[in-house]
């Protein structure tokens, strides 16, 4: 795969109406290589679109067009901060993305707490694939991982339960989780994968922590995702890529 600065990448800013909210979004697309796939990225709750631009450039350089948006009340976006509104925002952003790239296969990708949003919104879109990165099986499980005592469970809203969100969902699902994720340990990633159905694939990113994939985007993390979205690789090849990338990162630390 090519390096991010090889092909030209076009970046554009967009405003999206989501009910009573107005969302800020950034779209990145390749201009020197064909578009292999298109994806909407639901980022983590503590992030904003500008921090995802390096990821978008890397994706575009390798044939993946992407739209990243800020939820209502985040960054430049205006509106009420609620879980239901975040889900509405994802649906509105997905519909907007389809107008930008109408002839390409379109997927939904959630990262961190954005996995809850993406999974909850997926059945309200016609996305062809779903990717859940650095995620969790339920918001309660995420809260416990943050350190909230289990006896405070009644204070945690019963939202973003993957099993409920994906009930009846039949599209291909890829779960990606960092081997060294401390915020949402690998155990949560495996639990998430188990709830996604027998056809879901699990890709363990060797030696990756929680925030590394967007703070320091590299092809050994994002490359297999693009390949899977484009339908270029089988599960066995992805497992081989996992081993090879882990070996390379191990050598880099020596």
Give the positions of each predicted feature.
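Short beta-strand/loop motif that positions the catalytic acidic residue
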Residues: 169-170, 175-177, 181
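An N-terminal hydrophobic leader/cap segment in hydrolases
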Residues: 1-17, 24-26, 234-254
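Conserved alpha/beta-hydrolase
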Residues: 59-78
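Acidic catalytic loop of the alpha/beta-hydrolase fold
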Residues: 179-184, 211-212
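Catalytic histidine-centered segment of alpha/beta-hydrolase-like enzymes
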Residues: 208-219
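Alpha/beta-hydrolase active-site loop
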Residues: 81-100
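Short alpha-helix in the alpha/beta-hydrolase fold that links the catalytic acid
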Residues: 55, 162, 171, 185-194
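The serine-hydrolase catalytic nucleophile loop
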Residues: 45-57
């Amino acid at each position: 795969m090519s390096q991010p600065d090889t092909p030209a990448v076009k970046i554009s800013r967009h405003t999206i109406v989501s009910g009573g909210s107005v969302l800020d979004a950034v779209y990145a697309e390749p201009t020197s290589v064909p578009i292999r796939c298109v994806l909407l990225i639901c980022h983590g709750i503590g992030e904003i679109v500008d921090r995802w631009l390096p990821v978008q450039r890397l994706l575009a350089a390798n044939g993946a067009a992407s739209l990243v948006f800020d939820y209502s009340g985040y960054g430049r976006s205006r509106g009420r901060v609620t879980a239901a509104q975040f889900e509405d925002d994802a649906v509105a952003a997905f519909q907007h993305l389809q107008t930008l790239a109408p002839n390409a296969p379109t997927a939904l990708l959630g990262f961190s707490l954005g996995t809850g949003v993406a999974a909850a919104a997926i059945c309200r879109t016609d996305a062809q694939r779903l990717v859940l990165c650095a995620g969790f099986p339920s918001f309660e499980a995420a809260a416990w991982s943050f350190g909230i005592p289990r006896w405070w469970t009644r204070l945690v809203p019963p939202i973003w339960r993957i099993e409920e969100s994906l009930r009846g969902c039949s599209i291909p699902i890829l779960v990606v989780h960092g081997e060294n994720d401390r915020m949402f340990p690998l155990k949560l990633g495996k639990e998430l994968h188990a709830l996604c159905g027998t056809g879901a694939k699990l890709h363990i990113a060797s030696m990756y922590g929680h925030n590394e994939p967007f703070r320091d985007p590299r092809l050994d993390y994002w490359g297999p995702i693009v390949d899977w979205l484009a339908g270029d690789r089988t599960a066995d090849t992805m497992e081989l890529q996992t081993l090879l990338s882990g070996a390379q990162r191990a050598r880099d630390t020596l």
